[in-house]
């Protein structure tokens, strides 16, 4: 019988849960409005629900009245934003994911030691903008192997590399290999800076790909890790669609006769996954559902001390 194979783990990670709860608890404690620098996570369902509760999402701190509370999103901010918040008398609450903070700390430490940092990631992504702000004159962002080949440093220069936490493990591995080939002495962290949730969701998806011929990745188009999941499937020759609403699950699926894989990005609510699953079962009523467990997750991050 044809079936849906549902990846596990999928959806919310510990950093996303912490960020959302930070906004919710702040609203409960202090009432509306609570200002949030950037979307707290990259999913419009989450953002819309928090906006209904009284969160106001802004990009410029000038939009925040003096002496108000402002929450920094899970993606992190550059030091200049923290300084501006302090100068304007804002009460800052930091919802930056702890794994992103770890990368910030490493960059600061190695920059102070005199290293030039190679930052692997999407240069326009808010996480990369935040990390780069730690030492802008000592950081070069690279997105691909061609940019590695164009780097101006010598093999003897003191270099250190880290990655955006939500990259494709496949792409990151290729870029790192190119870096190490050019710069055998380059340093990095003892463990990957791609976060555990990104690795687990990509691993869970890779695990089911030999069994399916179509994959739905439930997630927002703005979500880096959701887009990377789609690319993981496509890189292995499996058709994949990134959808964020059941209306986007269309009759296109009727063209495919094999099993269907479903996963979800780290900022995707489970109720959206279930709604897409129901739509799929309406289109193909005789589908069975099988859960494929890749690894159990039990990571929990504490809320900011202000809460």
UniProtKB/Swiss-Prot annotation:
It is an enzyme of class 1 (oxidoreductase). Its EC number is 1.17.7.4. The active site is at residue 127. InterPro entries: LytB/IspH. Belongs to the IspH family. It catalyses: isopentenyl diphosphate + 2 oxidized [2Fe-2S]-[ferredoxin] + H2O = (2E)-4-hydroxy-3-methylbut-2-enyl diphosphate + 2 reduced [2Fe-2S]-[ferredoxin] + 2 H(+); dimethylallyl diphosphate + 2 oxidized [2Fe-2S]-[ferredoxin] + H2O = (2E)-4-hydroxy-3-methylbut-2-enyl diphosphate + 2 reduced [2Fe-2S]-[ferredoxin] + 2 H(+). Keywords: 4Fe-4S, Iron, Iron-sulfur, Isoprene biosynthesis, Metal-binding, Oxidoreductase. CDD domains: lytB_ispH. Pathway: Isoprenoid biosynthesis; dimethylallyl diphosphate biosynthesis; dimethylallyl diphosphate from (2E)-4-hydroxy-3-methylbutenyl diphosphate: step 1/1; Isoprenoid biosynthesis; isopentenyl diphosphate biosynthesis via DXP pathway; isopentenyl diphosphate from 1-deoxy-D-xylulose 5-phosphate: step 6/6. (2E)-4-hydroxy-3-methylbut-2-enyl diphosphate binds at residues 42, 75, 125, 165, 223-225, 267. GO terms for cellular component: cytosol. This is 4-hydroxy-3-methylbut-2-enyl diphosphate reductase. It holds the Pfam family LYTB. One of its GO terms (biological process) is dimethylallyl diphosphate biosynthetic process. Catalyzes the conversion of 1-hydroxy-2-methyl-2-(E)-butenyl 4-diphosphate (HMBPP) into a mixture of isopentenyl diphosphate (IPP) and dimethylallyl diphosphate (DMAPP). Acts in the terminal step of the DOXP/MEP pathway for isoprenoid precursor biosynthesis. Binds 1 [4Fe-4S] cluster per subunit. [4Fe-4S] cluster binds at residues 13, 97, 195. Dimethylallyl diphosphate binds at residues 42, 75, 125, 223-225, 267. It comes from the Bacteria. GO terms for molecular function: 4 iron, 4 sulfur cluster binding; 4-hydroxy-3-methylbut-2-enyl diphosphate reductase activity; metal ion binding. Isopentenyl diphosphate binds at residues 42, 75, 125, 223-225, 267. Its cofactor is [4Fe-4S] cluster.
